[in-house]
């Protein structure tokens, strides 16, 4: 998922007919529009596919997210362990779950900890299973076992990256991240870089430890 959610509020004041008419407009907000149509139940997969030519496989994935959204809203703030665990497995952020249940983000985080629902870090397979490889390159998720091996022998420093490169922004922020890591490594620290842009140099598996 990794947008906050598929609910934008842009279509709240639009009738069903207006929403369906908007489906003919090709723009970057179509995913939100499709979610709204599925939320209202005003068009079938076949109809959405016929207008947009988006494969029904993708439409079904959007529908799964919308169904989870409905379940969270319908729980009346009484989030049980299984519902919260499934919502986090599907990558719904704490702040969104909080908004839909009338709680604060801090309350959702504390509830997760109470239920033992925390992120795991899985190793990225940089060779796509073509042959065995181990790289210090991990992604976080709420599904599966943690694959990070603890190393308590060296002092560690975490460098926070600047995230995706925005339009009009240069690469100077990523340049700073990389050179920070290199300088800290030369001083003997074990370096950990946290970023959410897989296309930058700072997230190359051989930059940090």
Where are the predicted features?
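ATP-dependent carboxylate/acyl-activation modules
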Residues: 1-208
């Amino acid at each position: 998922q990794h947008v906050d959610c598929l609910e934008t509020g842009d279509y709240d004041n639009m009738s069903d007919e207006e929403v369906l008419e908007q489906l003919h407009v090709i723009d970057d907000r179509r995913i939100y529009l499709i979610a709204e149509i599925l939320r209202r139940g005003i068009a079938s997969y076949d109809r959405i596919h016929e207008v947009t030519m988006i494969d029904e496989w993708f439409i079904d994935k959007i529908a799964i997210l919308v169904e989870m959204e409905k379940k969270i809203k319908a729980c009346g703030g009484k989030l049980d362990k299984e519902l919260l665990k499934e919502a986090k497995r599907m990558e719904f952020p704490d702040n969104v779950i909080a908004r839909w249940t009338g709680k604060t983000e801090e309350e959702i985080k504390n509830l997760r900890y109470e239920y033992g629902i925390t992120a795991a870090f899985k190793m990225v397979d940089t060779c796509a299973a073509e042959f065995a490889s181990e790289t210090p390159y991990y992604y976080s998720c709420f599904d599966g076992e943690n694959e990070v091996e603890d190393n308590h022998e060296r002092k560690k420093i975490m460098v926070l990256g600047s995230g995706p490169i925005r339009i009009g922004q240069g690469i100077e922020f990523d340049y700073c991240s990389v050179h920070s890591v290199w300088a800290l490594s030369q001083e003997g620290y074990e370096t950990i870089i946290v970023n959410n842009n897989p296309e930058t140099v700072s997230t190359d598996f051989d930059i940090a430890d």
